[in-house]
Amino acid sequence: MELAWHIVAAEHRFYGGIVAGVFDFAPIHQPETVGTARDIAQWYGQSFERNFRTLAELSGEQLVKVLDFRGLFRLPAVAYLNFSLHHTIHHRGQLSTYLRAMGGKVPSIYGESHDSAEAKKAAQTPT
């Protein structure tokens, strides 16, 4: 659950920083009402929708403004969209490895996973 929350909170932070023109590194605490994976997914869906609308309204000038990220990077705001994407990809990969170790089925992420291919074969096999 902590990793899932990290993914959505970090993405929200990246988008908020791009919009504001400066990153705020204050913790984004998981709301008490967000206690399950389903809750996290719902929170993400709602926040992404708002963030996407706001990002879509940014001007070219805002998107090329150079933003500092913890003194580690100084990139145009638009570059942090890609940075955020790669951050999310990295952690989704982590989540997928945890699923199998916990006995879960790994869903299709980029093309079929072994588990999704097996499920597809099983669905096509007459019983």
What does each model-found stretch correspond to?
Residues 55-71:
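Acidic catalytic patch
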Residues 16-17, 21-58:
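Helix-adjacent hinge/juxtasegments
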Residues 46-49, 53, 67, 121-124:
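Hydrophobic small-molecule pocket/channel-lining residues, especially in calycin-type beta-barrels
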Residues 35, 50-51, 67, 75-77:
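A generic short-segment signal for beta-strand/edge and adjacent turn/coil regions
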Residues 1-29, 68-127:
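Short, contiguous alpha-helical
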